[in-house]
Amino acid sequence: MDQIVIMWLYIWGNLNEYEKNIVKLLTDNDSLTWNELLDKTKYSKSTLTKYIDSLNNKAIIKYNHNKTYSLNDSMLKTWLKHKKEIEGQYPL
C-alpha cells in the first residue's frame, strides 16, 4: 500500500494545475462528458482537449463507452477522497 501511495504522490506532484483540476472534478463526479468538463472547468475547447489528451496518455483518465471520462485507477480516486476527507482539501 505504501508503494502505491508513493507512486500517486509522485504522479500527482508532476501534474499541472489544469490537469489536477480535471482529476479533482472526476473524483467528485465519478464521470463527466467532455461538455460537462468544459462547463465546469471554464477552459477553452483547445485547452481542455490538450489536458484531456495528456491525462489520457498518462493513463490517469479513460474514455468510457457512454462517452464520459472517468479516473482510470480506483486507488487514485480512493487516495484523493481520503486526503480531502482527512485534510479538508485535495493535496496541493
Q: How should each PLM-predicted stretch be described?
A:
Residues 1-43:
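Winged-helix-like regulatory helical subdomains adjacent to P-loop NTPase cores
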Residues 20, 49, 73-74:
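Non-catalytic, well-ordered alpha-helical scaffold segments
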Residues 33-34, 48, 62, 87, ...:
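Secondary-structure transition/capping residues
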Residues 41-58, 63-66:
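Short amphipathic alpha-helical interaction segments
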Residues 64-70, 74-75:
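Short, Lys/Arg-rich nucleic-acid/phosphate-binding segment
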Residues 75-92:
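Short, amphipathic alpha-helical interaction segments positioned at domain boundaries
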